[in-house]
Every structure is written in structure tokens, then in C-alpha cells.
UniProtKB/Swiss-Prot annotation:
It catalyses: 7-aminomethyl-7-carbaguanosine(34) in tRNA + S-adenosyl-L-methionine = epoxyqueuosine(34) in tRNA + adenine + L-methionine + 2 H(+). It comes from Alkalilimnicola ehrlichii (strain ATCC BAA-1101 / DSM 17681 / MLHE-1). Monomer. One of its GO terms (cellular component) is cytoplasm. Transfers and isomerizes the ribose moiety from AdoMet to the 7-aminomethyl group of 7-deazaguanine (preQ1-tRNA) to give epoxyqueuosine (oQ-tRNA). The keyword Cytoplasm applies. This is S-adenosylmethionine:tRNA ribosyltransferase-isomerase. Pathway: tRNA modification; tRNA-queuosine biosynthesis. It is found in: Cytoplasm. Its main location: cytoplasm.
Amino acid sequence: MHVDDFSFDLPEALIAHHPPEQRRDSRLLCLDRDTGAVADRRFPDLVDLLRPEDLLVLNDTRVIPARLFGHKPTGGRVEVLVERPLDRHRVLARLRASKVPAPGTVLTLEGGVAAEVTGREGEFFTLRFTAEQTVLELLEHHGHMPLPPYIRRADVAADRERYQTVFARRPGAVAAPTAGLHFDNELLARIGARGVDTAWVTLHVGSGTFAPLRVSDPREHRMHSEWLDVPPATCAAIERARGRGGRVVAVGTTVVRALETAAQDGAVQPYQGETDIFIYPGHRFHAVDALVTNFHLPGSTLLMLVSAFAGRERVLAAYRHAVAQRYRFFSYGDAMFIAAGAADE
């Protein structure tokens, strides 16, 4: 296996830098995971592709405005990207500056916020904010939405809403679970009216989701760690769905990683803690029967996960079809629905 096995040609013009006017305006490419057959649909058609006995599992993480700009005591500019809060006043963060600040350096950030560099852990730094407000309160007031690096523009006020799912509840992610961005409340209501149950997991997406592989053999790659919670109620909902012959439909690769982490012994069990699970071709799936997902970067771990689910050649053929049909790619782009028989329903 080589990372180049997961490459494809993508014209720059197909990278979506802005969301569609309405969440549901996205297109939906349906892929049969068994045969490779594809069909072009619209995202609201997902209602008809789901069956009353199915279970839709969504990630309720909430993106925090994790990016801050400021300067060092020397006047040099610095950018802070919070990876995760450690407590009420400390964070783990990436720093971008012409020269890395040493421990003890006090950074002056937007709004006059002061943060002291207290240590370094590999590619991350620990920062302590000196204000009385909590880290999350400071970020809500002064932070910027952490748009992905391939969206080459500054964040705007609308991103506070659109780079966030309508069901986001638990703050902690620094990247959106983007498959969930296509759902609005009306679409969720229609899915519920069809008889489809909904369940929740939390996986706080880290900035490592955008990190390129630095090895040629993906099996040598070490995944970043992310916090997740698969509650007992979700495990019970999965058992009920399976009992009535329904499918477990994961909305996004984050849900797949959460459920497969919780099902490493076969059945999905309650789980709360860290995961660094890396799913690539050869993985045996225990928890997921169908997948709603966006289009992913060439050579990325997320494309490898989708390839594990539906087969590398079938997925890459579907991507070539998507390019030819000018689908929009990545976080603000279009979506796929992958399941057995998905192109025929």
C-alpha cells in the first residue's frame, strides 16, 4: 500500500470556498459500495434513500472559534490555533510565528487578551490565559472560526453559523464534522417523520484531521488523538435498529471512527476517552452499514477510510465521476451517500 494509491486529479476550481446558499442545496453522489454503480441526486433525496428501520448517527460536537491573532513582545506577529482546552484557563495549541516563542513569553492577542507560553509538547504548545474569563468565553468573544487551510480566505461572520452543524451542542472541535453541515432542521424533521431514528456521538475533531501523511506507506502513519463519547443510549439505539433489520447510517467519518472505536470487540459498547484509530483498506467494519460523507483530499486519511468502506477503486472511480460532473469538494462542498444498493434506490 502506498499513499499515491489514493491520489486523484482535482481542478482548483472545484474546491468550495463558500457554503451553498442553503444547507440542503448540496448535490449528493450515491455510490453502491458493492458494485461501484453511481447516481447523481440532490441532498434532500437522502430522506427517500433512508428506510424507516434505519438509525442515523450524528456527531454533536461544536466548533469553537479556535484561531487567535496577536503579537509577541518583540512585535512579531503570531497566530494561535487552539487544539483543545486543558482546563478553564489553559490550552494546547499550535503556534505560527517567524520564530517560535520560548516558555515564559507572554503573547498579546486580539481584544488585549494575554496568554503565557508555559511549555511545549512536540508540535503543540501549552498556553495559560491570564484573564478571569474561561478559555471558551475568551474564544467566543475574540476568536475566529478555524476554516481549513484549503479555504483560502479570511473567516467572515457567516462562518460562525455555516461552519457549524444545526445540532452542534458540545464545544470542543477545531474543525467541523462537515457531513453534518448539509442538514437543516426541516430536513431532520422529514427524516424523523419517515420513521428513521436518530442517535448521537461526540468526537471533538482536531486540527490533525488536515495533517498530510509524511510516510509513503500509510500503515506506518500514526494518527492524532481525539476525544470521543459514545453514550449508552446510542449503543441501545444501534442494538434496536439491528434487531429490526435496519442499517446504522453514519453521518461523517468522525461518526465512523467513534463507532468503530467503541466496537473493536465486535458489538458497540459505551466509550468515553481518546481514540487514535486509523481506518484504511483491510479494516473489518463492525458498527456501520452506510455512510454520508463529503469529498476528501487526495492522499488523506479520510479518503483511506472511505476506501476501506467501499473499496479503493470504486471510490476513486466515483471521485473521477464527481470531477467530471463538477461536484464541489471538501468542507463546504457536496456529499456522498455510500451503501449497498445506494445507486438503485
